[in-house]
């Protein structure tokens, strides 16, 4: 009876003890992050670094509308294909949009020489001035400028020709040698385009130009070329057996371009004074134009995001996140989210930072939970929480700032004869893309690992801070909790939290209670030893009596014979 009483008193003493625990915040977040060592770690707070959504629209870029070429491509627009007349007034744009199946390019069959290079040059142009470089009425008085039309470039059912070129033919039965020049006084680069006609037979050559041995010479400071017509039979394209090759050059400010020919020249009529602008570009897209504004445009749609990475499209125009192949880039800012199991009781797993966090502590990341005669409650440690928030916020901002180099990324241009170069370029681009993706993912993994370790360290430091104050005035009971050997009211609890706990004040009371508890433990241990001995002896006696009874019964019925020899 005495032993039972002592054990009961011991249990009551443990139940009534004042307790303080160190723990961390938990919530109902389902955010998961990856670290170097773990995948899908549930955390209380995190930030997404990867943009994966767009609006599916073509938008104005910083308030400036794009130039939609519609059914025309770059060649048709610049040469002046009659079907592209609606594009003639275009003067400025934020970016240029081609459709994948644009059908109106060069209308008279032939080849546009160095077309891909021209597209590359144009991708950095944001506006131009279209002007008459060689006025039609005065530049070629000895040549016909009116009959050079073709059904291949028909418009409204009638034969026509490019709006920016003049097809010069003989006049009055002759094609005298022509010489004409232009001096660039625009103060900017001027794009000049011209063509060379290659008839299919000598009859057409004589009909159009009279001279059989014709030539065309085009010369500037940076360009010097002499062309000879190639007269040969060819299969018809767009009902034309002849061909026309198209050429271009950029004329620097102050430079002069000179044309000399005695036949087959498709002369410049209009030229373009170019104004380059950073952030322009050419994209190929089927998306439609809408009344919207953006800072970043992709062929799939506009991106309005300040995140450093995106996985939508590698081609971008404007201030855009860096394209990576990652499916997820999430950086942790909070803690591991392991809400404690409520049914285990307040000071079981719920109390500690080992088995779980506290959903009840909402005003900080780290803090305390106490229980005494005045009640119980949570209190966040504001100083350590604020220091952690500041540190992590600065780190996240630094990562975003370093990686958030927003820029335009347009595709490179290659013609059909440069497939090996194009394939090599794709491999190089893929290599750089893999490196960028790897660097981005590794950066996030490392920073997530460091952040979670940082939180663990902060909780441990808070625990050690309390432990160093309480010393032997309390005992560690696991899960981040301490059980006081003395009464600790709310004022006492607050002193532990703010680091002003008066150890000497409670030392004597703690010493007495500690000795009482130790005494109960010793006496309880003696009682248990006596009970153990008694239990052993009693069990042995019961066993002997049972064996004797069984032996007597077996002897009496003859099952067992007993002989005693003297």
Curated annotation (Swiss-Prot):
The organism sits in which domain of life?
Answer: Viruses
Residue stretches spanning the membrane = 530-550
Gene designation per UniProt? HA
* Glycosylation positions in this chain: 27-28, 40, 286, 304, 498
Organism for this UniProt entry: Influenza A virus (strain A/Henry/1936 H1N1)
Q: What name does UniProt use for this protein?
A: Hemagglutinin
Q: Which residues lie on this side of the membrane: Extracellular?
A: 18-529
Main localization, broad class: virion
Which is an annotated Pfam family here?
A: Hemagglutinin
What does the subunit comment say?
Homotrimer of disulfide-linked HA1-HA2. Interacts with human CACNA1C.
Q: Which family does it belong to?
A: Belongs to the influenza viruses hemagglutinin family.
List the GO biological process terms: clathrin-dependent endocytosis of virus by host cell; fusion of virus membrane with host endosome membrane; fusion of virus membrane with host plasma membrane; viral budding from plasma membrane; virion attachment to host cell
Spell out the note in the miscellaneous section. Answer: Major glycoprotein, comprises over 80% of the envelope proteins present in virus particle. The extent of infection into host organism is determined by HA. Influenza viruses bud from the apical surface of polarized epithelial cells (e.g. bronchial epithelial cells) into lumen of lungs and are therefore usually pneumotropic. The reason is that HA is cleaved by tryptase clara which is restricted to lungs. However, HAs of H5 and H7 pantropic avian viruses subtypes can be cleaved by furin and subtilisin-type enzymes, allowing the virus to grow in other organs than lungs.
């Amino acid at each position: 009876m005495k032993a039972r009483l002592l054990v009961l008193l011991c249990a009551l003493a443990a139940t009534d003890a004042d307790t303080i625990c160190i723990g961390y915040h938990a919530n109902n977040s389902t955010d998961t992050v990856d670290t170097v060592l773990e995948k899908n770690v549930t955390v209380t707070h995190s930030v997404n670094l990867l943009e994966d959504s767009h609006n599916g629209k073509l938008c104005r870029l910083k308030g400036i509308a794009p130039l939609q070429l519609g059914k025309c491509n770059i060649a048709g627009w610049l040469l002046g294909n009659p079907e592209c007349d609606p594009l003639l007034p275009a003067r400025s744009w934020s970016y240029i949009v081609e459709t994948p199946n644009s059908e109106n390019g060069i209308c008279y069959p032939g080849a546009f020489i160095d077309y891909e290079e021209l597209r590359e040059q144009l991708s950095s142009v944001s506006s131009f001035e279209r002007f008459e470089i060689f006025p039609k009425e005065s530049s070629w008085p000895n040549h016909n400028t009116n009959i050079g039309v073709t059904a291949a470039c028909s418009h409204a059912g009638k034969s026509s020709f490019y709006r920016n070129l003049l097809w010069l033919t003989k006049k009055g039965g002759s094609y005298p040698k022509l010489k004409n020049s232009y001096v660039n006084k625009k103060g900017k680069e001027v794009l000049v385009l011209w063509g060379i006609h290659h008839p299919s037979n000598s009859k057409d050559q004589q009909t159009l130009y009279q001279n059989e041995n014709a030539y065309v010479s085009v010369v500037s400071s940076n360009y010097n070329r002499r062309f000879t017509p190639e007269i040969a039979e060819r299969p018809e394209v767009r009902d034309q057996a002849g061909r026309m090759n198209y050429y271009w050059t950029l004329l620097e400010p102050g430079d002069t371009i000179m044309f000399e020919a005695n036949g087959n020249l498709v002369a410049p009529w209009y030229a373009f004074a170019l104004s380059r602008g950073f952030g322009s570009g050419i994209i190929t897209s089927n998306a439609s134009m809408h009344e919207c504004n953006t800072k970043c445009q992709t062929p799939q749609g506009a991106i309005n995001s300040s995140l450093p990475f995106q996985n939508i499209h590698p081609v971008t125009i404007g201030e855009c996140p860096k394209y990576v192949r990652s499916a997820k880039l999430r950086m942790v800012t909070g803690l591991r989210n392991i809400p404690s199991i409520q049914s285990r009781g307040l000071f079981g797993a719920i109390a500690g930072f080992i088995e779980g966090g506290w959903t009840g502590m909402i005003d900080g990341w780290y803090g305390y939970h106490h229980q005494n005669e005045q009640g119980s409650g949570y209190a966040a440690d504001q100083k350590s929480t604020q220091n952690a928030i500041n540190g992590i916020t600065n780190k996240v901002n630094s990562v975003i700032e370093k990686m958030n180099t927003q820029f335009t990324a347009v595709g490179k241009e290659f013609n059909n004869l440069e497939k090996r170069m194009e394939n090599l370029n794709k491999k190089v681009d893929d290599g750089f893309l893999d490196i960028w993706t790897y660097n981005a993912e590794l950066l996030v993994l490392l920073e997530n690992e460091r952040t979670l370790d940082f939180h663990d360290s902060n909780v441990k430091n808070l625990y050690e801070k309390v432990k160093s104050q309480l010393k032997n005035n309390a005992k560690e009971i696991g899960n981040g909790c301490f059980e006081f050997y003395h009464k600790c009211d709310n004022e006492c609890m607050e002193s532990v939290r703010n680091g002003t706990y008066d150890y000497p004040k409670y030392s004597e009371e703690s010493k007495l209670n500690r000795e009482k508890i130790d005494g109960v433990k010793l006496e309880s241990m003696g009682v248990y030893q006596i009970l153990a001995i008694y239990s052993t002896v009693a069990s042995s006696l019961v066993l002997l009596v049972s064996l004797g009874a069984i032996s007597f019964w077996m002897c009496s019925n003859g099952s067992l014979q007993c002989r005693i020899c003297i």
